[in-house]
Amino acid sequence: MEASGGVGGAFLKDVVAYVEVWSSKGTENYSRTFAKQLEDMGATVSKTLNKQVTHVIFKDGYQSTWDKAQKTGAKLVSVLWVEKCRMAGALVDESLFPAVNTDEHLPNLSRKKHKCMQPKDFILKTPENDKRLQKKFEKMAEELQRQKAALDDDVPVLLFESPRSLVYSSPVNVMKRRLQDMKEKRENLSPTSSQMLEQSQQNPCVSLFETSLNISHQPLSSDESFASGSHSSFGDSCGDQERKLGRSANEMTTVTCPSSPVLRASSFYGSASPNHLRQPRPQKAPDSPSKESINCQKDATGAVADSERKQAAGVSQGVPDEKLCLSPTMSIIEEHQVRLGPKNSSAKRKRAADLGSSPKGKLKKRYKRKSALAIQLFKSDQSPPSTIRLIPGTPDVEASSYEDYFSPDNLKERNSERLPPEAQQLASPSLFHCRGLSKWERRNMLEMCDFTCIGEKHRSISSISDLISKSASSLEKPVKEEVNTASTCLLLVETSANDSPGLCSQPGPQLRDDTGPEGSSHPDTLSSSAHHITPLKGNSTETRDPGDGKGSPKEGSTPPASASPEDEVHICNLSLGEDCNVEKSVEEKENIATGYSESVKNGPGRPDPSDSSCTGLVRPQQKPKKSEKEEKPTRTLVMTSMPSEKQTLIIQVVSTLKGFSFAPEVCETTTHVLVGKSARTLNVLMGIARGCWILSYEWVLLSLELGHWISEEPFELSETFPAAPICRLERHLSTQQYQGTLFANQPKMFIAPASSPPRAKLCELVLLCGGQVSPAPQLASLIIGPYKGKKKARIQYLSEKWVLDSITQHKICDFNNYQLLQ
């Protein structure tokens, strides 16, 4: 029993405790519960075992903790010491509750390992509560300050002047140093436009390769990185080619360098003005080259350029209304040529001169051989026409452009090589953009395409749309079939449960909303899907009612003279319209007495799963049986007047030691009632009436200490509830279902509807103690509770407390002390 003055005091204020309490298997840590109790009593709980600790609450903990506690001289006590201090309200002698170390004499190899299966509380680490993180932040701050101090004026600075803007500030001396380093490392520097013009005159190979190599470097963000990357990628290859072949500068001007497949593009406005180069969307104002250099180049390559222009003019005259469109890769090249400005102008003129100087027959032969690879460009009204042809190269160079060829940007270009002109004209609008196509653009492009020329079978867009609609309908079919199948199975279970007498009825979630209040199916549902229903196998000759047993009385029937108390309760409830939740069938009561009650394992309203009549039914929501070790225990335990922290500890102990399941109220399977505070509750009275153990909280604590359930008798609350051991012994000695005899010799009682505790509970208590309950006040000699009707002299009107006190003391109390005022 709990001491009245010991609760809430700070009588352990001088105690500094370290708690280490584990389960006997070493998988559950109960330290937090006992630490909370110590804090409530005023003790200081330390998270670490240090020199300030005076008491160590130890149970099945680490051997290192035990050794350290003995070394420091702290007092090792068990969990019972904490409970005794709480009950006594004062500091109890520690020698009465010494801690036990079961692993002290065991070898190191056989010691149990502690592995807590409880989830830890997640605490977000911040510099304020984590020293390691704080040190890391301080070190980062010191490093940042050191780097700032080491910065000088020569280091480039990134300036974020406004959102989404970045200014790169680089002093001149840094650029000089960078150029010098690049020269020493023999790297190709990023040339200016004038340097690129000179380079194109000296080395025509470079000007021919620029266009093809711009493809792979277009995604680079800055022009500087683009120029340095492109020139470093092809400069060395051209130099090596010159050294290998040993060609002179004159030979290089007449022969095209075959180091890569070159895309030769000549842009012009139209046949009327073919001499001017097209520069769409200029982003920078390029430095225009001098007229002298242009005229000089024009004189040197005039004849060849004229022939080239005539040829291009012939192409444009052949298709005067069409705009020859660039693929995404070509538009990337053209856009970057505009950025580079005059360099590409000179490169184009120089390239025209180089190609023009080659023999005429060779060119014709080459064009005939590669006519299938020519990229025909398409119609557009927005930009002037231009022609692009693919010039062949050696296998080595083709291997070097392997990545570019298989890049996603060139996918449509490769597809366009295989498509005829009609299909390409329809696909042309999507090829202007350098970016990827959106879903909307892709769909529009597919709608515009004519696929009649592709493959052997001709299929129109309407047939394709029909195919798509068919596929969509085929995708929807399985879903509908699954729904139909589910509804068929549902109806099959319903009809087999209600219509066919040879099948076992199975109430439950399978019927859902399709069954009426009595379990019958709706007629329209059955008639609409009657053709889906097929008979089930596995018939039996017996049907079972899931609600009541064989011996349960029917409604409206008159009870026999020798009716059991359960039958009387049933009749009482039917006449009054209230459910007392007490009545059970005779068959179920006998099953509980013999030890195989289905009400615990399968619930009171479910049929026996081992019944052979249910073998033909499919139960999707019922899980397969597990082994007997994992089955739910048949004994239930009820807690009453128990604080929440104690409830948590009891739940953990029961889950560790096994053998019990929890129930919210005392029922026919309850064997133990744990009482937190010695207060008379309905669960305590129900436990007494059913012959249960009425135990204190210490029984669980000592069982936890020893690692198994111990004898209950020393912890039975027989002083507070004298009837508890008497009823328990009567239940133990009874060979059949236990039935109390306290009210067996009392006259019939009528429980008033306004009684407190509730009428149903009082009815159950009276019947469990052998009394008789009358459904009407005219048939009773005792009326329990406040009665508003006309009172008669022959009837005793007693308070509800008479029933409660009689059950608690296990004797019939005097009526005179419980008479209600007339």
Curated annotation (Swiss-Prot):
Tagged with keyword Cytoplasm: yes
Protein task: Implicated in chromosome condensation and DNA damage induced cellular responses. May play a role in neurogenesis and regulation of the size of the cerebral cortex.
GO MF term set: identical protein binding
Cell location: Cytoplasm, Cytoskeleton, Microtubule organizing center, Centrosome
Quaternary assembly: Interacts with CDC27 and maybe other components of the APC/C complex. Interacts with histone variant H2AX under DNA damage conditions.
Region called Disordered, residue ranges: 182-203, 219-243, 266-295, 335-366, 498-567, 594-636
Keywords: Cytoplasm, Cytoskeleton, Phosphoprotein, Repeat
Domain remark text: BRCT domain 1 is required to prevent abnormal chromosome condensation. It binds directly to the SWI-SNF chromatin remodeling complex.
Entries under InterPro entries matching the protein: BRCT_dom, BRCT_dom_sf, Microcephalin-like, Microcephalin_mammal
Source organism: Mus musculus (Mouse)
GO annotation (BP), single: regulation of centrosome cycle
Tissue-specificity statement: High levels of expression are found in the developing forebrain and, in particular, in the walls of the lateral ventricles.
Bias type Polar residues, positions: 189-203, 219-235, 522-541
Comp. bias intervals (Basic and acidic residues): 542-553, 625-634
GO CC list: centrosome; cytoplasm
Residues with the Phosphoserine modification: S273, S290, S327
Residue numbers bearing the Phosphothreonine modification: T329
All copies of domain BRCT, residue ranges: 10-99, 627-717, 738-820
Protein name: Microcephalin
